Structures are given as structure tokens and as C-alpha cells.
């Protein structure tokens, strides 16, 4: 587990520079972040307020007494001042302290520090956390409660990494200065220009991510916990699909493909990831974390077919290429556990309007139709190729749950039993329990969802999940937690 490391700015002697020099120094505007750890390093992200080179130094301790120096790209307005560098050549299974500085033609920023752990090369205990759905439904950074404190709580669990299951922002939901609650209380928000209206331009989409990182808890989390990040719909607009044309008076730009292009670019600029490391240069990829764990990040948004009653003979949510990739990569994995990060749930019914559905399930409890046919193919192939120890993790529905899937209860039976765990939201409106479609035989072993009138983060229905893999036995334990870190549910799965 990671030791706590202070995130802060180094003091600069006043005598070292006059006022004119101070104004020309670059500034790190939104902290630092790490992502996608490997055995020899990770991606380091930062943002500058002016053109400047990204400089990263690493050390084994926070004293930075023996450093390695990495020179990254020039951060420019073309990418909204953001940039990243993949660190390589570091020892496996090691705590790495890093210090980020900006260099603008010799004028140096004050540094910011962070810490991460490289992935192990041998079997050892592994802890990850996951969740999603950040600052939605008008619930933003509330100064009355100290901001988005759930991020501080998650950082204190000392995970090796965090899977962000999507809805990293709510680009389609403005954040007002105040929000009246059903019980008469008032939720107050810190506000920004970008969050005053729905996002339509590239700069407005960028501003969604910038807003979240004005929260000190989130910046602390970013500096202490590496992330694997995927997207869902609200990085663009609710329930979107490729080719959609909006009938929505809030938008002057009706072409969702244009909005998605802006949302995609802003997402990749502002998250600690390298787009070129994804299979298609977008999201989906396999991340190995030692011999006990492989994570398969999915993109269930870019290739899905239009929202519909979802009862056609064949449908797609991953697309043939991604589905084939998932099957082959899982079959070739030698890791004990294969964790699939699906940004949309497998059996929860997610309506889009009165007749259409936007996720996998169509609500008829029968044999696979529509997008269910693609999942059926994947599950049957995993069974045929004897892929064992599979766990699916998701968010999206704004509550937490444990779902056990079994062919003994299912309309479609050609698959091995497995578990899917749901978590979220993070400082967003809490959701009510959704209906489970019986096609793949799910059973809700646990649900913690908001009752009517209890959607505010003040009401306690915010969640994250935690997975611990025992380095000796290889067993996997799932713990579903509330925003205070209280364990609501625990389940241990034995390796096969």
C-alpha cells in the first residue's frame, strides 16, 4: 500500500526573483495525476497556464535525495495546456514519488508532488477501488461540506489504483449556485462559467473537467492514486449513440457526432491516460497488474447501435472488433483474475424514453435479442475457451449492488456463472434501484439504492467499491462502501 505523501507547492525564496519574474513563471493549474501503472512506470499528467515543458523527477522517497529526471512534451494551448509523459525504466512493485515542474524558457514553476506504485512482477496483495458518476444532477463542489470528500475517503484506503467507470463529468448538466432539496435544505455549489450551461463547444467540454479539479479532495486523490479511466455517456450527453441527431432545445448543435468529437478530445486531454495505448486510440485496452490480475477496460459507447426497443435479431454495444478483442485477450490472459470494467451494466434495464433502451438489457427476460446477442456470444465464447475467474465492474446507475449470474436461472444458458458488482455515484444524484432483466439469470445479492426524496449526497447514498486480492491464496474479496468508507457488503470469491 502507498504511504501518504504531502501534495503541496515548494516554497520559493522571495529574494530569488523580483515581481516581473514572478509574473512570467508558469503555473501548474490543476494539480498532478498518475494513471495506467505498469511494472516499470506510469503516465504522469499536468496542466500549465502557458506554454512550458513538462519536467518530472522521480525518487524512492519523498525527500527526493536521489532523483531521475524525465523531460516531457511542451504543454500548449492546442491541448488546453494539458500534457502527459509515460515514465519507464523504474523498478517493479516499488513506491515512486514524483515531482512535476514546468519550464518556460528557463522560468520554472513551483513544483507539485505525487506518489504511485509500479505494478508487481510477482504475486502479491493487490487492492483496487472503482466507482463513477462525478458531480451530476446539479450537485457540484459544496463548500459547506468541504467539497467532494468521497475522494479523500477513497485515497485513504491506499489502493494501488482506481478504475474510473465513466461519467467523469456531466457535460449535459449545468451546476447552479444553489439547489433546493425536497426536505427544504439548500445545496450550495461553487460555480464556473463552463458549468453554467450544457457543453457544446470544445472549450465548454474542457471546462467540465477543469471544474471538477478545482476541488482540493479530487486533486489530493489524483496525486495519490493512479487511475484507469474509461468514459460513458455524460462526457458528451445523456444516453448518446453515434449518428444521433438531437431534438433538444438546449442545444444549438444537434449533431451528436460533433459533440462527441469535442467530448472525446476534452476527455483525453484532461485525464491521466495515453490515447495511443488504447487498441483503437480511444478507450478499450487490457491493463496487466502482475500475475494475479488483468483489467479489461471496455468502450460501450463509441460503437453501440442506436437506442431502440432493442429487440432486433442482432445488436451491438461493443462492435465486432472490440467484442472479438475482448474474447481473445481474456482467453490469452494468464492472470488469475480477469476483471472486466464495463461502463454500462449487463442486466440492469436502462430506459431511454418510454419505449427505448440504451444499455444491454431490453427488459423482456427472454432469449437474447438486440444488444444482448453480443453479450451472449462473448459469454459463450468465454465458457468454450475455459476462461475462469471473471468479475465485471460497473457504475452508471448511481447506486451500489452485487449481482450473481447463473445459467440455472437464465433464459440463455451457454455460459459459466459469474459476478458483476455495481458502484457509484461520486458526489452526484443518487439513483433508485433498477429492474434486472432475467435473460442471463442475474440475482441481486445486495442493493443499496436511494429511496424517494433522498437523492442528495447529503443523504448518504454515495458509493465506491473495493477489491482485495490475497497474494498467497489468490482469493478475491469485494467490499461495497458508502462515501464515509463504511463497509455495506462483503463477498469473497475463491480462485478456481
Feature locations, PLM:
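Metal-dependent phosphoester/phosphodiester hydrolase catalytic core
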Residues: 3-6, 18-496
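Hydrophobic helical h-region of N-terminal Sec-dependent signal peptides
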Residues: 7-11
Amino acid at each position: 500500500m502507498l504511504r501518504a505523501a504531502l501534495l503541496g507547492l515548494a516554497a520559493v525564496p522571495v529574494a530569488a526573483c523580483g515581481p516581473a519574474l514572478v509574473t512570467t513563471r508558469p503555473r501548474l493549474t490543476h494539480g498532478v495525476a498518475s494513471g495506467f501503472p505498469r511494472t516499470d512506470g506510469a503516465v504522469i499528467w499536468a496542466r500549465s497556464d502557458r506554454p512550458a515543458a513538462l519536467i518530472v523527477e522521480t525518487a524512492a522517497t519523498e525527500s527526493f535525495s536521489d532523483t531521475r529526471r524525465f523531460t516531457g512534451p511542451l504543454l500548449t494551448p492546442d491541448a488546453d495546456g494539458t500534457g502527459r509523459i509515460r515514465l519507464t525504466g523504474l523498478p517493479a512493485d516499488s513506491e515512486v514519488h514524483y515531482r512535476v515542474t514546468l519550464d518556460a524558457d528557463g522560468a520554472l514553476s513551483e513544483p507539485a508532488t505525487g506518489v504511485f506504485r509500479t505494478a508487481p512482477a510477482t504475486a502479491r496483495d493487490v487492492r483496487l477501488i472503482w466507482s463513477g458518476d462525478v458531480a451530476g444532477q446539479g450537485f457540484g463542489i459544496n463548500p459547506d461540506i468541504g467539497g467532494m470528500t468521497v475522494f479523500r475517503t477513497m485515497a485513504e484506503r491506499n489502493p494501488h489504483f482506481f478504475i474510473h467507470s465513466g461519467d467523469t463529468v456531466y457535460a449535459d448538466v449545468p451546476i447552479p449556485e444553489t439547489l433546493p432539496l425536497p426536505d427544504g435544505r439548500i445545496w450550495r455549489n461553487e460555480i464556473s462559467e463552463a458549468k453554467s450551461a450544457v457543453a457544446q463547444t470544445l472549450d465548454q467540454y474542457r471546462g467540465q473537467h477543469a471544474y471538477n479539479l478545482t476541488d482540493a479532495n479530487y486533486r489530493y486523490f489524483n496525486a495519490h492514486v493512479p487511475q484507469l479511466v474509461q468514459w460513458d455517456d455524460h462526457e458528451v450527453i445523456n444516453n448518446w449513440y453515434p449518428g444521433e441527431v438531437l431534438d433538444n432545445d438546449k442545444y444549438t448543435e444537434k449533431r451528436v457526432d460533433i459533440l462527441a468529437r469535442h467530448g472525446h478530445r476534452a476527455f483525453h486531454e484532461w485525464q491521466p491516460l495515453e490515447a495511443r495505448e488504447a487498441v483503437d486510440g480511444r478507450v478499450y485496452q487490457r491493463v496487466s497488474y502482475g500475475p494475479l490480475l488483468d483489467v479489461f477496460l471496455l468502450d460501450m459507447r463509441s460503437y453501440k447501435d442506436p437506442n431502440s426497443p432493442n429487440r432486433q435479431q442482432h445488436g451491438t454495444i461493443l462492435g465486432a472488433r472490440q467484442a472479438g478483442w475482448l474474447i481473445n485477450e481474456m482467453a490469452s490472459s494468464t492472470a488469475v483474475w480477469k476483471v472486466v470494467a464495463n461502463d454500462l451494466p449487463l442486466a440492469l434495464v436502462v430506459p431511454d424514453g418510454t419505449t427505448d433502451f440504451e444499455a444491454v438489457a431490453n427488459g423482456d427476460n427472454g432469449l437474447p435479442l438486440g444488444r444482448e446477442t453480443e453479450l451472449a456470444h462473448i459469454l459463450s465464447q468465454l465458457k468454450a475457451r475455459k476462461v475462469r475467474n471473471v468479475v465485471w465492474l460497473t457504475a452508471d446507475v448511481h447506486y451500489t449492488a452485487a449481482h450473481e449470474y447463473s445459467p440455472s436461472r437464465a433464459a440463455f444458458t451457454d455460459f459459466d456463472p459469474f459476478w458483476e458488482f455495481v458502484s457509484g455515484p461520486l458526489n452526484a444524484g443518487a439513483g433508485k434501484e433498477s429492474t434486472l432483466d432475467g435473460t442471463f439469470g442475474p440475482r441481486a445479492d445486495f442493493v443499496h439504492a436511494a429511496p424517494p426524496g433522498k437523492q442528495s449526497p447529503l443523504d448518504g447514498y454515495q458509493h465506491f467499491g473495493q477489491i482485495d486480492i490475497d497474494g498467497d491464496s489468490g482469493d478475491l474479496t469485494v467490499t461495497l462502501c458508502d462515501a464515509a468508507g463504511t463497509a455495506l457488503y462483503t463477498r469473497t470469491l475463491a480462485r478456481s
